[in-house]
Amino acid sequence: MPTHEHTQWRTLALMETRLALDAETKPQLKTGTLVIARGENTYVGRSDYGIEYEGAQVRSILACFSGTRTCSEIAHELACDLDNVTSLVAELDALHFLDTQKSAIVLSDRYRAPGADPISDSGLCDDNLDATFQQIKSRIRPELSLTTWGPEVRDGGVSLMSARQDQPVLIYGNSRIAILLYGILLSSGLSQTTLISDEPSRLIGDIDLCGGFLRLSDIGSSQNERITNIRPELSLFPLNCAGSKNPREIAISVGPPTPELLQMWMSECIPHLFIEDPECASITIGPLVIPGTTPCWRCTALTQDDEHIAWTEVQWQRRIAPRHETPVSVAHHVAGLAALELLHFIDTGNSDLLGSTFRINYLSAIDAKYRTFLHHPACGCRW
């Protein structure tokens, strides 16, 4: 039994959870959840929150939470009351420390050998004879350690990872950030990611080498050809030659987009994320726009134009001025943050960048400025 007092919201959550669980549930502790013996008591949780139980039997029950045995099997094996097992499962599930469902990642357009195990411990449709499956099992584990902690996720994050395969993402740009972001998204499971350069004939140069996947031997090669050739190596999942099953694209503009692109994204209701060109020793990520729902890029522009006398003139000068590359450390930082927010949006439908911007100062990257915008009355994005 827990040693701390139950709050009302936990009691209600526990009652709802028990209704969804039964004796055939196969509980598994989420990745990173700690079970620590404290004398006769047992602590379950992590460094920032957890719960402590009295009695040695709880520890024996927890040791069986591996996802391979049902609650009834655990109770029979330990010769304990089934209600004790299901009550423990319900409470830990309400605290989001357990996975209680099984899902499988089915790779798009892949042959499966007869008799292959439908679900492995990693959540993959397993095939011991397929080297691709074995490689993916190793690469997917770190990704699942993130997705399993998402809200209402009870299958280890497997279904979220599986859905990423069919989500098309278009990255517009050819800067360090754009190229790094392309590699990160492919390696994170977004196999339908495409990098679209505004210079189709651009060659890889010295400045493109920034600790990413481009090498010294790539200098002088066509950027488009190299990006296309490296794609199968970067992608977590095999590429689906049949194309995406998800019709809703997501666009990312690294640098200023053309008016034609902006109009297309808004008119076709394509969610889009902005990553501005660097300005002096700072750079802005956002907003992430859902057309017709959240404030658009023009809303943010009109708001800032109201606040700063020369804002419009400054923006025009920035568009015609020579572009400058970001420092290597900043490029990796920005690409990583943008990728995390985009993945969170794809997985959950939510993001801190919806209608908001994140301005990073190179000299104090931790002390970034987060700002939320409202729909501007002079903008017609909601008319």
Name the predicted role of every residue range.
Residues P2-W383:
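Adenine nucleotide-associated cytosolic modules
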